[in-house]
Amino acid sequence: MSSPSETTKTPAALDRSKSSGARKGVRKYFLPAPSASKPVSQGIEEELRAIGNRSGRSDQQDTRVKDASADQTTKPHPDSWMHSATRLRLVGLTFSGGGIRSATFCLGVLQALEGLGLLRQVDYLSSVSGGGYINSWFLACRRNKIASTEDQAAVGHLRSFGRYLAPAAGFFSADTWTIAMVWLRNSMLLQAILVSFIALLLLLPRFFQWALTNFPASHLMLAWISTFGLLAFSFAAMLVLLFKQNAGEEQRTGILSQTTKPLISLKGQGALQIFALVPLLAGMALFASLLWNTAKSGVATLPAELLFESALLTVATFVAAYISIMRDYKRRIGALAGSILVGAVCGALFFALGLLVFRVFQGWARYDCPGPGSWKAGLWGAPFLVSSVSLCVVLQIGLLGRAMDDSIREWWSRLAAFLGIYSFASFALELLAIWGPLYTFSLANWIVGAAAGGGLLTTIAGLVAACSPHTSGTDRFSFKEILAAIAPFAFSLLLLVMISTGIHYGLTAHYFQSSVPAPAPQAGCDLPPNNLASARPPQIEGTRSPVTQEMVKDYWQALSHSSQQDIRIVLWLFIALAVVCLILAWRVDINEFSMSPFYRNRLVRCFLGAARAARGERKPNPFTKFDFKDDFGLAELKQPGYDGPVPIINTALNMVGGGDAGLQERRASSFFFTPYCSGSEQTGVRPTIEFGKGKGGITIGRCIATSGAAASPNMGYHTKSTVAFLMTFFNVRLGLWTRSPKFPASQQGARWGFWYLLKELFGTAGDDDKFLYLSDGGHFENLGVYELIRRRCRYIIACDAEQDEHFVMSGLGGLIRKCRVDFDVDIEIDTREIRTRDANSYSRAHCALGRVRYDRNDRDQDGYLVYLKASLTGDEDGDILQYKAENAAFPHQSTADQFFDESQFESYRRLGQHIAKSAFETREPGTSPVILSDEWIEHLLQGGHSPSPQMGGCQV
């Protein structure tokens, strides 16, 4: 008898169960694990039920939501949560990014809204970056039953920690030196991993050179067989992938159609690189070695049999791959015959190019006594042979002409691109490893100064580059932008050359200290007078150590000695570096040894510690001044004891390395944390308690630190690969690697984080990996309104305190575009009264009121956006205007200033309080508190609270 679970299976489920056994072994190694997440809509449904229950509005919820939650086997209506959100008439409040500036401004807004009776009407409290600071303070106060946002002790704690990163300023302050020591410790560990890895790569050419010059003549036949075997495997893999990925499903009937499924199942270009390009590069390196040794042996020319073998190899692999994939090849005999002819011609071209390489090698071999001949062969041989395959691809496309489909041409074109990448990478590696130290001889007297100056210059350039033209409004061809683009390249090149030079000096020190005789010239080797001088770099005027012929000769002799007689030393160094790299990569957590924990601990001490300090419960360590009980799990806020709004902490999911063409400008998406669930549209969501370490799930401190991780190598649309390299190497890293909701939460941290560190280094974080890179929410949307639009809030109060001295309002503009594209929602708002400023830089209004068109055909579903902008209209209190008179940039002082004194703190707080009161405080006596309603909003829209310089009200 079948079990109940078996009887309820759908036909699709039965089909999946039948094939699951066959795919089990394949999935383990090649296929992604089945998604463990749920859609965002299901997470929102849980939030709405909690809001309805807390506010007493649960009877208004759409019954379809209740039914769906009661019967898990019934699929809920896809729009049921939207109907529920509309009926609940949700109120959302948002705090924008902007560091401590935004936090203090939004504190004033909070206090004003509470005084007006509006705060208790808020259902969602959404924050980004600096707005998250004060969001966490408010949540901690509500959790600890602090009755008012005006609580003197809680607010006083914030004032005393206005310099939250280093409360005690000064050169000899322990706080200041702690910043330096934490950064230095973490950077040294991180750099040890990266430098050892780079050194490993730079040692590889020396092993290749040893194989190139010590190839036993007795094994030449075996080497030729191995070479053609590797090339045959590589070509066959390319063609199998080509046919399988471009043939129709009904055509894939050959014997390899099923057995090569793992080959196709790899995501992206993984199959091509693992099974085709890596063997091809290895085969070409071996081929170059054979050509060099044949040239050294004195053979006049390559045997003619190689021409036949090259053509036969190409034809055989083509035919075998074609037949193995498409069983109906008999009906395509004409096309197959034409392809065979093309394959033969391509094989002949490859032989001709190989013969050209052989002739060049013969010339170099005559003067290799010792000299750069063998090293030139290593530098040019394999890259040129790999590039020759690209030329064969070009010839093949041209000969097939109209007979080749566009899809096939595109496939071959992309293959040629990868061949170019691999060819250039191998060439650059050999050039840096071998020729880099040689060129440093000419720079010997000022290389140290250049390195120090270059490091300082590129560090400054990295900070400049963080101010992207997308938001700064500056000319992208300005000097700063050009410097930011060039300096990271210069530093990266300098770093690689310095590591290469260090390796060279370390390996050749023994040669120069001992009387090692120079290698004797080989019999029949010509030694023209200028053979060594031809390899030297150009003379640099003004240097005290000119590169002489004798210096170049010594260099090549030492290099040849270390790569031949002392190859064991090279091997032991390689092993030692590998051990160091592996151990550190295993033990050094890429999250815990970034600057994020330092940042998080100080945010927690300032903003979350305030509530416990107000209650007299905070007991900090007398030495460090930290109390790690200040922080608590975000998931705790869904418990019955908490009666505040549902917090949404917004971060940016970096998708720089993703393949979605629609995200090429954004290069990030929204990733949110709430007490109920966390995730994104791309990854789905999981219960928040399953994120982070420990039973309580991810903490609020970690969430707000991630939401405020502005300085990160991957920064959404701000990301630049060269700046990412610079910031990662110098450990300017505040972002967080967290497990994707797609995968089970059995492990939150990557045991081997080195792979993800490389993604950070090259700026290629994506959304398909097990671990995702989250950074500042402002790298996607800086107002925090995006997720409230997704939840269809009826009333949204948006506080914008981002740095915007020119009133560009890029945050609002980006929000409008994203909502129109992603949700098909239009936001209609006129901000001209805020933008228009007089000679004193005073705006005509502090805020603007707009409509949110959730449904263009149903105006009853419209929402309303109240946009509060940090601005001055001239009606502010005297202390605010006095601070403005002394600080012209107020209220848009740089976000880099995270050290607020009392005057600065109080000025921003009072400004936020003033703007919120002027926007919402009604003129009619006896009508307070304000109740958000359509009637009240329409009253404003019809001029009931028109803007005026005296009142500083809303523009409508």
Name each model feature, range by range:
Residues 2-956:
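Catalytic domains of lipid- and phosphate-ester/thioester hydrolases
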